[in-house]
């Protein structure tokens, strides 16, 4: 389109008219313009002039070329000569009105005449003319012609005098002097008309300025004018260039911190440059950067500083706005005033360079603008540098460049030393630049005085400008750098990223108090800002302002603050006010570098401290905290001194500039904000208090917080990344410390938490985020938690969660805390007291020896804490976690290591971590991290879960809502973001909550605390952790399978073992598991929450959604409860427990060994100690088991919570894996739970106490872990595929039970939390053997994996079923593999490869059939809930077994191959590794059990001839299922009377006792599972070891019976196995580990309960089987042969057995898949066993109830589980029938 640009002469801008063509006519242009401008053609005409040529267009037809610019004027119609004021229309005289009417009515009057006609109506003219005339007349008076005054025409009035010559007689225009250039008229004298004389002042000189002539003839001027003239009024035209005025600038000088270093004027749009942290005008710095060739920073001269990296300095901008508002200052050309800061920049750059890397923010923190006087800044910078240089020795390592800054901060940081240094440095530097340093000096004194809070306040107030600078980067940087800079420097993590670390909590508080908001801002977006701010100005200017920067200079980074917090309450006391002394290692004088023990790495590099190798900063921090900080504590100001200092500083601040006032106001606002936050924190603190109150809780809770702290330490720089780092930095050191220390660390974190500023986010947030408090805290601030707890809040909360008694927010952010205020003082003292008590209570105990040690225990908590933080907040955390996944970081960071690994595995390690994750996760599965954390969690969860489990539905609902809103946000943020956090710090966000782990831990905790759904979420997390690996990759899923195997073993052992033993064992297991993998975490969640699961499961049965997840939890709980119940039930069961424990421990150990092999050694320092013994001493299995049991005892409570959380995890995994799976699991869990409950109700009286709980526990534990797979599988996808699909979305977080329990946050949907259940010695031995087996069976697993994949691909309807089958196969295989591993490792390798292929083919076939059936139901009810899922699995397994039996016939053939491939591949996957690990464990214990079971089964398995073909398939399947079966047979063999007898004998009498079988199945669910697992294992062994035996068909009846028995076991065990088998791929091992395959989250509640029972049975059987392992090992081959036929028959009878099995639980699905084999065992047997299983379940439920009662929620959970079990039972019965039909079809098919 062509266009012409026009503008009215009165307008500034051109408008455009568009037209077609090259030209537009003038007429058209006028029309368009009038149309656009809404002008009326009658109103005026338009005069168009060419804007360039000034040519006026007059011809309407003139063509104006396109793209011309024209100027438009409105002119009257008819036009006006542009230069003339006379109208074009000639008129004699203006016709006013009708004065001169034209009376001659000629026939046609001219228009000119007509316009003068008065009576137009009678005029002789056309109407148009009349109208025109009328218009003209009406507007004539307004005609420009009439504008001229007539008086100028003709002789003027006699009184008129010419204005030019002053003579009368002519107008000025006619003045004769007009042409006289030499004429000068005298001054014109005005008359004072209208001005009252009273306002006038007579003057004599008429020439006086403003003189006027009065009516009296005298001259006068207005009085006010005279006064103004006397003063010399400067009236300037508005737009004249201003003369540089000295008045307002001088009167109200701009604070230097508000001055741009470049333009020397007040900053506009202040931005922080990341390199040195200085602030400039946005335009100035951008111009400077762009004008420099290499984008060189004008201050620090760093090259390649991208203008895009500039961070808006919101605080400084606010300060500038406030300054402008207060002073009315308008930006003037102030560039003339080059401030002295230029010198500062050089030193500052120096500092900045040194500090820049280390303390970037501090030094650079804009020495100039931030420094009150730029000169001061420079001077200060220099002195700071010098003094800092003195400090540099101390700071140099970390913050060489921060010396100058450090000195100032030093005073802040080190109270005493700080003061001297501060006064000396601050005053020196500030006073050096005295002009502007006055504020700086005040600041300095402020710093020296109240290096803590007042320092910040003073600094901020004194350097109000700094508030702006600190505001975002500078303020925060200051505070962060002061308190946090150290960590910042320490980890370089974000210079201030580790606010908690660098600025001790308090300095953070003080500086952050002032900077609280900034920290948050910084956390969010200003980390770099902080770095830059802190770097740039922080050290010099900011240091002055905020002594903290100096501290950051000290490498004593963050960790120091925490120590002061807890290690030295006195020190912390002075410190909290904002004193950052702890920032230096307080022990170290500001000038001294922290001692090696402190191991403060250069700020940029947190070293693995001597004490704590993993947390880069952690150990140093911890050491420093415990040791150095105490030393420095003395130097830090005493409270009185501190208050005095602060008072003095405040007074000085009051003297400061308005900017300071503004800053103070700003700080006050911040303080208010912090107060709110602090109160929240207190709230959290209170809730935390319970943890503090409870030693365990504290240990675990503190651990969690410690995790927060450790994580914080770890993420020091990340810490800046708002939440994780907080938590994270705190946690790593602590976690490294060990449990006690970990708690200490946490405590320390709490100490940190004094202001808990450490997290940048308000301390309260830390509490909030990290709140480890039980529901007390949670209940207290669930909403708070919810509300603020977005990601940041949670992160913050996590961050603060572990904070020791939190001081006031003011204290936290020092700035706002005015300790002069008696209230503040008192509050601070109170805080000190509390802190001291807290410290004495928690930290002191741990500080000495425990802190470093707790890595094993603490690691559980810490890693989780660390992980989220690490992953989320800090690349270090993330990277380190990954790097130290099992290594140094894994000790304390076992979780962390795991976490990063998991998260990393999830994200970065998705591909490589599939295998790596397998091993690592399996290694990590035994990781201690989880156990420890879960211990904490257990403790906390005991309270929490009591509350949590009380209202599972409500909690779950609210948690789900909350989680979906906040926790899922957080979860997604924390857990889900964990992956991203892994890759990128949030923020978590914000805030990380150290949310990755912190998120997980917190998420778990939050989930549990917030809701049972939270527990569910945690469970889901566990599941997710367990299945996170699987979801990460199916490879990871299998990896998770092994982890879950480990979990299963752990859970098994915990299940069987006494709750305390379980707790211990699970804690140990979890410890190993957590670092090892999400599976471990899940395991932990599963393991720890066994009790929790039982409680939860029972409650969850009431709340089906919650139920589902909680059923899983309950299964864990029940497993736990079942352990004692099982023991009570049978002595054999305790033996089984031992066996299972040892098996679990072995598996754990294997997993642990893997973990240790990878990075678990570090991570499993604790595990290494505990599990290391286990690993090293398989013989001391029981000893380790005892430890593990001890651990598990603690975790038991946590297990409840843990279990509960895994439900959610499972749900999340399911959601992620398959939303169908979610619904399916929920519904399946619900329905199967209900079914089981009803079935169990019948059986419950028999075995509910022992077996119901066990079943629940086993089911729960497995369920929680396996839920992932069930979710995946139930969801209708191969776990592998799902894992692969979810690999990116899901992250497997391995948490120790304690970590899991302590984790308040709801796991992100994408996060699978695997709870590491501490492995018993036996479990570890099993694990070791499993590890060998894994090595052996990994190929088989690899083969199995394709099966699952193929299954998924080949049988879409039975894809899930296949997957389930595969999962079942995998667990069976794994169980079998573990057994064989020790005895037939090589044979199994070779034969298992062959037999696995054949067996797995058969088994895969059956499983795939069951899987297909299961999956079809799963797919159908995929949308259903987990219980539905399992119910659907069962029902659809039954129905689908019918359908699938046909499709299974087809699919089975394909699935045989697929199963062989998938199963082998699956087994080859990490799941397989886990399976193998489990198998290894199972081999030793399970083999014995299996051999026993197989001997019994031999009786039952005459029809192995039938198994010949099916046997090979069954073998493969059993190779998977046998781990489960092995576990089952372990259980049933361990408790042969119950399980074996019912199962083994039932197998023979399977047909006779179909109905009976239901009860026995329930009863023997675990036993049968074990049997089934044992049989499967034996079958697997047969397939592996006795491949030839597989063809050896005993009798199809025997095989059927065996299969039925196995199926029944599988059914009993598979009940949970349904979802379990879904999860199986990943959780195969875990199911296998748990032999009871508790984790059928599809039937998570009932199945989980069954699983728990079964798992407990498996645990008991495990013990018995372990004892019998030798016998079984011998019999293993024979039994394996029988088992294989049994498996084959299981497959054939998979349908029949699946009916029962399915009715029972995922056992159907496992029996087909596992569930298939198990189901094959015989529908009657299945029914009998189901009954037994349900009896077991009920017993387990009873035991679970007892357990839950012990835990506080036992009754409710039991009720829930009973209800669920009933429903599940009902569904099971339905499923049984369906499965029977399906089994029959399958048998026909087979």
UniProtKB/Swiss-Prot annotation:
Coiled-coil ranges (or none): none
Q: Which organism is it from?
A: Mus musculus (Mouse)
Subunit structure of this chain's protein = Interacts with MDM2 and YBX1. Also interacts with p53/TP53 and RB1. Interacts with NEK6. Interacts with ZBTB38.
**GO CC list:** centrosome; chromosome; cytoplasm; nuclear speck; nucleolus; protein-containing complex
Q: What is this protein called?
A: E3 ubiquitin-protein ligase RBBP6
Matches recorded under PANTHER family: CELL DIVISION CYCLE AND APOPTOSIS REGULATOR PROTEIN 1-RELATED, RETINOBLASTOMA-BINDING PROTEIN 6
Give cross-link positions for Glycyl lysine isopeptide (Lys-Gly) (interchain with G-Cter in SUMO2): 1107, 1169
Sites where N6-acetyllysine occurs are at: 130
Q: Return the annotated region ranges for Interaction with p53.
A: 1434-1544
């Amino acid at each position: 389109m062509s266009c012409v640009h026009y503008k009215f002469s009165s307008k500034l801008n051109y408008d455009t008219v568009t037209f077609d063509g090259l030209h537009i006519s003038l007429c058209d242009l006028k029309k368009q313009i009038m149309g656009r401008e809404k002008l009326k053609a009658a109103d005026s005409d338009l005069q168009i002039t060419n804007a360039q040529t000034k040519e006026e267009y007059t011809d309407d037809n003139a063509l104006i070329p396109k793209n011309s610019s024209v100027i438009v004027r409105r002119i009257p119609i008819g036009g006006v000569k542009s230069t003339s004021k006379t109208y074009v229309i000639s008129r004699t005289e203006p016709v006013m009105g009708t004065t001169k009417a034209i009376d001659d009515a000629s026939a046609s009057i001219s228009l000119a005449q007509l316009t003068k006609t008065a009576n137009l109506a009678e005029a002789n003219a056309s109407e148009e003319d009349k109208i025109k005339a009328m218009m003209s007349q009406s507007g004539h008076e307004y005609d420009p012609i009439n504008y001229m005054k007539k008086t100028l025409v003709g002789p003027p009035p006699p009184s008129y005098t010419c204005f030019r010559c002053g003579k009368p007689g002519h107008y000025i225009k006619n003045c004769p002097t007009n042409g006289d250039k030499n004429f000068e008229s005298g001054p014109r004298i005005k008359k004072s008309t209208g001005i009252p004389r009273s306002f006038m002042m007579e003057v004599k000189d008429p020439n006086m300025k403003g003189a006027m002539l009065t009516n009296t003839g005298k001259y006068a001027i207005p009085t006010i004018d005279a006064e103004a003239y006397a003063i010399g009024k400067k009236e300037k035209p508005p737009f004249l260039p201003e003369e540089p005025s000295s008045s307002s600038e001088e009167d109200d000088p701009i604070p230097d911190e508000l001055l741009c270093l470049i333009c020397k004027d007040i900053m506009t749009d202040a931005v922080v440059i990341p390199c040195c942290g200085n602030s400039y005008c946005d335009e100035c710095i951008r111009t400077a950067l762009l004008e420099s060739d290499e984008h060189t920073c004008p201050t620090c001269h760093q090259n390649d500083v991208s203008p895009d990296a500039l961070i808006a300095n919101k605080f400084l901008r606010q300060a500038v706005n406030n300054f402008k508002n207060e002073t009315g200052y308008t930006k003037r050309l102030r560039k003339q005033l080059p401030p002295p800061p230029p010198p500062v920049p050089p030193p500052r750059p120096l500092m900045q360079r040194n500090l820049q890397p280390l303390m970037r923010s501090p030094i650079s923190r804009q020495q100039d603008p931030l420094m009150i006087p730029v000169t001061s800044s420079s001077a200060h910078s220099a002195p700071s540098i010098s003094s800092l240089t003195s400090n540099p020795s101390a700071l140099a390592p970390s913050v060489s460049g921060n010396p100058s800054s450090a000195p100032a901060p030093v005073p802040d940081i080190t109270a005493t030393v700080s003061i001297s240094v501060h006064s000396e440095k601050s005053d020196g530097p500030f006073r050096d630049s005295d002009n502007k340093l006055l504020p700086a000096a005040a600041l300095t004194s402020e710093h020296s005085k109240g290096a803590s809070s007042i320092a910040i306040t003073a600094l901020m107030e004194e350097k109000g400008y700094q508030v702006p600078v600190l505001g975002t980067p500078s303020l925060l940087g200051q505070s962060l750098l002061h308190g946090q800079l150290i960590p910042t420097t320490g980890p370089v993590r974000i210079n201030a990223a580790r606010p908690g670390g660098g600025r001790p909590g308090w300095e953070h508080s003080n500086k952050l108090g002032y900077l609280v908001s900034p920290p948050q801002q910084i956390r969010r977006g200003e980390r770099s800002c902080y770095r830059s701010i802190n770097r740039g100005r922080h050290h010099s200017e900011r240091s002055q302002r905020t002594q903290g920067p100096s501290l950051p200079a000290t490498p004593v980074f963050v960790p120091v603050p925490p120590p002061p917090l807890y290690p030295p309450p006195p020190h912390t006391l002075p410190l909290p006010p904002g004193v950052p002394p702890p920032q230096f290692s307080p022990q170290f004088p500001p000038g001294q570098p922290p001692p090696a023990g402190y191991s403060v790495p250069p700020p940029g590099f947190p070293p693995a401290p001597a004490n704590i190798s993993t947390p880069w900063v952690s150990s140093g921090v911890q050491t420093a905290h415990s040791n150095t900080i105490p030393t420095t504590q003395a130097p830090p100001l005493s409270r009185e001194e501190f208050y005095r200092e602060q008072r003095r500083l405040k007074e000085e601040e009051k003297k400061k500039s308005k900017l300071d006032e503004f800053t103070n106001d700003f700080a006050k606002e911040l303080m208010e904000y912090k107060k709110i936050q602090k109160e929240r924190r207190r709230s959290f603190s209170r809730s935390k208090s319970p943890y503090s109150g409870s030693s365990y809780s504290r240990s675990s809770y503190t651990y969690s917080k410690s995790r927060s702290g450790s994580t914080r330490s770890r993420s020091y720089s990340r810490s800046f990344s708002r939440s994780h780092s907080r938590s994270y930095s705190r946690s790593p050191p602590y976690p490294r410390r060990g449990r006690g220390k970990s708690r200490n660390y946490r405590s320390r974190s709490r100490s940190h938490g004094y202001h808990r500023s450490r997290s940048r986010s308000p301390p309260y947030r830390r509490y909030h985020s990290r709140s480890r408090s039980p529901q007390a805290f949670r209940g207290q601030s669930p909403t708070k938690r919810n509300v603020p707890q977005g990601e940041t809040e949670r992160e913050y909360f996590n961050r603060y969660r572990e904070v020791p008694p939190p001081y006031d927010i003011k204290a936290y952010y020092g700035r706002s805390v005015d300790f002069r205020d008696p209230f503040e003082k008192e509050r601070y003292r109170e805080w000190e007291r509390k802190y001291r008590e807290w410290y004495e209570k928690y930290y002191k105990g741990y500080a000495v020896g425990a802190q470093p040690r707790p890595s094993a225990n603490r690691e559980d908590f810490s890693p989780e804490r660390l992980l989220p933080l690490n992953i989320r907040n800090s690349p270090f955390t993330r990277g380190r976690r990954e790097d130290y996944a099992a290594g140094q970081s894994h000790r304390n960071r076992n979780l962390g290591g795991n976490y990063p690994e998991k998260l990393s595995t999830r994200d970065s390690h998705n591909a490589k971590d599939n295998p790596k994750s397998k091993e690592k996760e399996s290694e990590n599965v035994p990781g201690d991290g989880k156990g420890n954390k879960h211990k904490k969690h257990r403790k906390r969860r005991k309270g929490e879960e009591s509350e949590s489990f009380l209202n599972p539905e409500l909690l779950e609902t609210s948690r789900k809502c909350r989680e979906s809103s906040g926790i899922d946000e957080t979860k997604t943020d924390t857990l889900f973001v964990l992956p991203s956090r892994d890759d990128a710090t949030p923020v978590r966000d914000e805030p990380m909550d150290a949310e990755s782990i912190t998120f997980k831990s917190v998420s778990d905790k939050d989930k549990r605390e917030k809701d049972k759904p939270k527990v569910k979420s945690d469970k889901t997390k566990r599941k997710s952790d367990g299945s996170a690996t699987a979801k990460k990759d199916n490879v990871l899923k299998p990896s998770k399978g092994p982890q879950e195997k480990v979990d299963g073993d752990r859970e098994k052992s915990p299940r069987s073992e006494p709750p305390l033993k379980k707790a211990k064992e699970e804690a140990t297991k979890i410890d190993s598991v957590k670092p090892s993998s999400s599976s471990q975490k899940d395991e932990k969640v599963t393991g720890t929450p066994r009790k929790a699961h039982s409680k939860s499961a029972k409650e969850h049965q009431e709340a089906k959604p919650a139920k589902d997840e909680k059923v899983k939890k309950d299964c864990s709980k029940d497993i736990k409860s079942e352990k004692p119940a099982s023991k009570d039930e049978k002595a054999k069961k305790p033996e089984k427990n031992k066996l299972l424990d040892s098996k679990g421990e072995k598996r754990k150990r294997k997993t642990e060994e893997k973990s240790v092999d990878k990075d678990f050694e570090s991570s499993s320092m604790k595990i290494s100690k505990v599990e290391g013994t286990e690993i090293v001493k398989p013989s001391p299995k029981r000893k380790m088991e005892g430890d593990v049991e001890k651990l598990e005892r603690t975790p038991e409570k946590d297990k409840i919570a843990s279990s509960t959380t895994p439900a959610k995890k499972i749900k999340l995994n399911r959601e992620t894996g398959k939303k169908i799976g979610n619904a399916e699991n929920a519904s399946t869990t619900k329905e199967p739970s209900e079914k089981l409950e009803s079935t169990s109700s019948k059986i419950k009286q028999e075995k509910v106490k022992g077996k119901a709980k066990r079943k629940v526990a086993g089911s729960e534990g497995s369920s929680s872990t396996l839920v992932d797979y069930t979710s995946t599988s139930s969801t209708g996808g191969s776990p592998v595929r799902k894992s692969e699909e979810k690999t990116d979305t899901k992250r497997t977080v391995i948490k120790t039970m304690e970590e899991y329990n302590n984790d308040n946050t709801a796991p992100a949907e994408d996060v699978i939390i695997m709870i590491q259940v501490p492995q018993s010695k036996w479990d570890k031995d099993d694990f070791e053997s499993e590890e060998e087996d894994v090595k052996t069976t990994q190929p088989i697993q690899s083969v199995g994996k394709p099966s699952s994949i193929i299954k998924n691909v080949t049988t879409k309807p039975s894809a899930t079923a296949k997957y389930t089958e595969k999962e079942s196969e995998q667990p069976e295989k794994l169980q079998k593999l573990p057994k064989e591993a020790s005895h037939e490792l090589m044979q199994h390798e070779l034969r298992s490869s062959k037999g696995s292929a054949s067996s797995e083919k058969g088994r895969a076939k059956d499983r795939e059939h069951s899987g297909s059936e299961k999956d079809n139901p799963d797919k159908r009810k995929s949308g259903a809930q987990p219980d539905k899922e399992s119910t659907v699995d069962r029902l659809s397994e039954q129905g689908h077994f019918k359908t699938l039996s046909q499709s299974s016939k087809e699919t089975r053939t394909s699935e045989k191959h697929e199963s062989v491939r998938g199963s082998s591949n699956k087994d080859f996957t990490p799941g397989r590794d886990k399976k193998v690990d489990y198998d290894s464990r199972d081999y030793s214990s399970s083999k014995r059990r299996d051999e026993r079971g197989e001997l019994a089964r031999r009786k039952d398995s005459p029809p192995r001839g039938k198994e010949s073909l099916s046997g090979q398939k069954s073998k493969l399947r059993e190779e998977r299922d046998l781990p489960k079966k092995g576990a089952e047979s372990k259980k049933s063999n361990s408790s042969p009377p119950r399980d074996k007898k019912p199962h083994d004998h039932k197998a023979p009498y399977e047909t006779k006792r179909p109905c009976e079988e239901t009860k026995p199945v329930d009863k023997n669910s675990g036993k049968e599972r074990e049997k089934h697992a044992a049989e499967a294992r034996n079958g697997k062994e047969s397939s592996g070891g006795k491949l030839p035996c597989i063809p050896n068909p005993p009798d199809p009846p025997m095989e059927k019976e065996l299969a039925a028995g196995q199926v029944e076991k599988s059914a009993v065990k598979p009940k949970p196995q349904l979802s379990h088998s879904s999860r199986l791929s990943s959780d195969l091992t875990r199911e296998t580990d748990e032999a009871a395959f508790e984790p059928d989250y599809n039937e998570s509640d009932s199945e989980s309960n069954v699983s728990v029972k079964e798992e407990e049975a498996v645990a008991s059987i495990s013990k018995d089987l372990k004892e019998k392992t030798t016998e079984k090992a011998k019999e293993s081959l024979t039994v394996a042969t029988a088992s294989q036929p049994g498996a084959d028959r299981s497959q054939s009878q998979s349908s029949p057995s699946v009916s029962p099995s399915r009715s029972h639980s995922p056992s159907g699905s496992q029996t087909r898949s596992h569930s298939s084999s198990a189901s094959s065992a015989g529908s009657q047997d299945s029914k009998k066993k189901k009954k037994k299983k349900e009896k077991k379940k009920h017993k387990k439920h009873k035991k679970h109830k007892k357990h839950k009662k012990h835990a506080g929620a036992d009754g409710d959970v039991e009720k829930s589980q009973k209800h669920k079990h009933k429903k599940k039972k009902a569904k099971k019965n339905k499923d049984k029938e369906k499965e029977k039909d399906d089994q029959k079809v399958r048998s026909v098919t087979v």
